[in-house]
Amino acid sequence: MADITTVEALTAKIAEMRKAQEIFSTYSQKQVDKICCAVAMAAIQNRVSLAKMAVQETQMGILEDKIFKNHFAAEFVYHEYRDFKTCGVIETDEELGIQKVAAPVGLVGAILPVTNPTSSAIFKILLCVKTRNAILLSPHPKAKDCTCAAVECCAEAAYRAGAPQGVIDCIATPAMELTQTLMRSVDLVLATGGADMVRAAYASGRPAIGAGSGNCPVIIHESACIQDAIRSIVRSKTFDAGLLCSSEQAVIAVGSGTVEQVKNAFEQWCGHVLDSEECDLLRGLFATAKAKLTGKKAEFIARLAGIDVPKETKLLIAQASEISETEPFALEKLCPVLTLYQAESYFQALDMAEQLLQLSGEGHTAGLYIDPKAEKEIALWRERIKACRLLVNSPTAQGAVGSICTGLPPALALGCGTWGGSGLAGNLEPRHLLNVKTVAFRQERALSLRMPQAVYHEAGCTGAALLELQEKYHYERVFFLTDHYLYQNENVIPVLKLLERMGVMYTVYCDLTPSLTVEQVEKGITALERFRPDVIVGMGGGTALDAAKLMRYRWEHPEVSWEGLRLNFLDDRKRVLEAEKREQKTPLFTIATTAGTGAECTPCAVVTDEKTGIPWQIYHPELLPTAAIIDADHMKCLPKGLTREGGMGTLTRALESYLSLCTTDYTDGFALFSCKNVLDHLLCAYDRLEEDEAARRKLADASALAGMAAANTFPGSVSSMACALSAWHHLPYGVSCGILLPEVMAYQVQNEVIQMNQFFNRPYRSLKKRYRKLAAFCGLGEGAAREPFAQLLRAVQQLRDRVEIYPTIQAYGVEEAYFLDTLDRMTEVAWNHPWMNYSPVVPGIAEVRKLYLRCYYGEDWKEQRPE
């Protein structure tokens, strides 16, 4: 071992060891495991001689038990981690695209205790060899020779097995200055010893793992098997003369009857229960010569205190009632002396155990002897006691170090967590001596196509659809939801008569206004609960269908608050929501009567908070209807206003879905055909109204297609801004879309590179190329890179003008003063819309504000720039 007597010599040794460790860090797992095996075998072969040296040098402990500890440190630790990977790639998750690569921390400085010198050295050397770290050990001055012998034994075995020379060494002549320099110079400090030494390790300025003193309280419950408990405690507390820091320090017996049984059992198992006079004698000895008692046998301690005990006495039991720093029996005693307390109740016993840990040894170890069936009492103890090792019906000395009588990992360094001022809350393992590098490969977000289980379309399909759905779902009670206008004008009568012919009992709910509110949904839920249907049928435009979706979801998930449901999300799979996972109980069929939002096919809904007047855009997969019916016969009598507004809303959703970051080949078809249908047929339907049934069918299809595209891609800026504009200034949603769409299209093309989206996990798609493909699909010709976009933009503007939508907000009579007063709040709500994030070009809040101003003033608006 290194003859280091000066700081300079220590510094030179550390430099040598770092070079050796760099070589060691290149070793393969096979080479490392071979060295570990050799070290463990050498330690086992020399376990007896090392134990003899430890007892002789320290004058502490019991030879046979030290032999066992040496054997344990080598055999149990080697076996536990024999197949544990510590080199190269140690873990791979192909699904997540994650690799974990192990790297050694470098040079470890180990501070060793006088209580377990050789076994602690073997344990820490094995862990460092397993993790390809170099280790420089600093022994306790009273155990330096036996520690150096243990280190030399392990080092020679490691070198013979191929380890680089110099990766294991020991300071043969320890001194405080050298130990402090060591702690300040290594990459990681492993400190085992007294509280002062552990605190010094944490104050060194280097990463440290400390294993400090304990003060293990053990509760004996009335339901415990007293004989088994006492036999276990005696064997644990007398092991190596009580030198293990995890050994029992105080027994708390619950109830006077239990205390008497405990005393009798201790006497049977070679314990001596001290009377009050003997307790005073021993208390005085602890006050004056506690250090001399460490690791001594019970008979020696009794004789030193002037107490007569039988020769076979293994353990001294001192009765006490006080828990304080002035009571020596309430503190840690590294010798076969145990304190006995009486608690009147289990709750008092818990209080006493907490006080003992707070006094000394918080975070270390605690024990409980109890009937395993007393689950409530065990749970209460588990929750209240602040200890990292909670042992039930187990000897704490052997149980805490692991693998002997518990499933804990084998260790001779026991972390106490933050309760004990340690960064380690558990037993020291190889993983704590590794720097694990995580390699994360880029992943594409898994996408799914969400649409109703069945979509019925073509004119006159309603009857056939409902009959087919009845055969599948066998429904007998229908909650029929529509708006007041449709019910009053008897638009729903044909469907209700059909339900009557099918023999279905139904109730009609139509207490809805054009702007759906939270209060209306809550009233509808009350009606749902009263009728308890087999099926919900929603018929109408966006308001009625959104109401049906929200009522069903809130009826089946009453635990979900509106605040949670409307909360914004970045990823719909990771949203923060308190909903319990359960299967939907009630099918929902939607029948569209307008060609606009495509609500019949989407898991989206808009509801207004009547208190603030702000609309909430809600998205949830469980809002998706079970089946959708798109029957153009229900749309024959749409007036011009609903026709143009629905058409422009459809065009906006389809176009933005095609450009969305979440667009895929699956959704492109929906979006492209929807755009083409609107551009080709909206004007015909608008001009000829009921006369052009073919155009009506195309618009009905376009609306549903746009809805399915939007449900899976999330439309972007225009939809977000239109929702806010409609809410603040009471413009129809389609009108808002018609005003905003051309302006936002131009903005996006101009700022594609400047305003990048945050969702980098989606493949880049050139906005200009997408517009070119869209223009070509809609028959707007080919040309230069910008020409197709210009043609598409011109087509949208011309369509807007021909269906008589004004190009500015101001043209609709919105007062300038009111618009400017509400602009900032409206801008914030629009930008905060959940769909804004999925736009290919996400405008900032200031840009959204400017876009609103351009759309209010039109071409006359000029941006005010600072001089």
Predicted regions and their residues:
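N-terminal Rossmann-like NAD(P)+-binding subdomain of aldehyde/semialdehyde dehydrogenases
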Residues: M1-Q99, L127, Q268
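Glycine/threonine-rich beta-strand-loop-alpha-helix active-site module
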Residues: K85, A150-V151, E519-D633
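ATP/NTP phosphate-donor binding region
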Residues: L447-V535, I809-Q810
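Carboxylate- and glycine-rich phosphate/diphosphate-binding segment that chelates Mg2+/Mn2+
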Residues: C601-T713
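Gly/Pro-rich interdomain helix-loop hinge
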Residues: W728, V735-D821, W861-K862
